[in-house]
Amino acid sequence: VKLGLSLRKTSQALKDLYNISISHQQIANYCKTAAVCIKPFVDQYPYEKGDVFTADETYIKIRGIKTYVWLIMNAATRSIIGYQVSDNRGVGPCILAMRMAFRGLTRLPENFKFIADGYSAYPLAAMEFAKKFGKAFAFRITQVIGLTNDDAVSTEHRPFKQMIERLNRTYKASY
């Protein structure tokens, strides 16, 4: 259970509450091992796919190297249905994240919406899906640009963008 505690504070809490003596490094090792074990189950789980997906990419630094994390979320359930970690912001990682999000679908739902920021990789990836899979996967990206509601599209879709931006901030804060 994530309580927002550092590894050292988690170690101290286990000692205080349950009289379990374990080092912070051992907790980190257990977390890494658990992540490797559950990844296949998380990746293959048949998440419910709604008719509104929202996407965003953000960067994190791993040992001083900038790495990009692409996330695609089902807006209704707030489940992360697609993700990709890459060393660049190109179209390739965006396509891989979309491919993961669309896994299990034979066609897109009627009234499907894909909401993202103004980054050009999203429309290019959408064009690639339409080219490769035809009408069943032809969709347009609704781009919510900037931080203010300067047009009707931004006003209508801002909550979706804020949802994924909040996820990114939470992810970056806990990393």
Model-flagged regions — what are they?
Residues 1-53, 57-63, 77:
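Short, positively charged, Gly/Tyr-enriched micro-motifs
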Residues 20, 47-48, 107-110, 133-140:
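Short helix-terminating capping/connector loops at secondary-structure junctions
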Residues 32-33, 83-107:
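Active-site beta-loop-alpha junctions of metal-dependent nucleic acid enzymes
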Residues 52, 70, 113:
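Hydrophobic "anchor" residues on beta-strands that sit immediately upstream
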Residues 65-71:
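Short glycine-rich loop/turn motifs
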Residues 111-118:
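Short glycine-rich phosphate-binding loop at a beta-alpha junction
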Residues 118-175:
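Helix-centered, glycine/charged polyanion-binding patches within enzymatic domains
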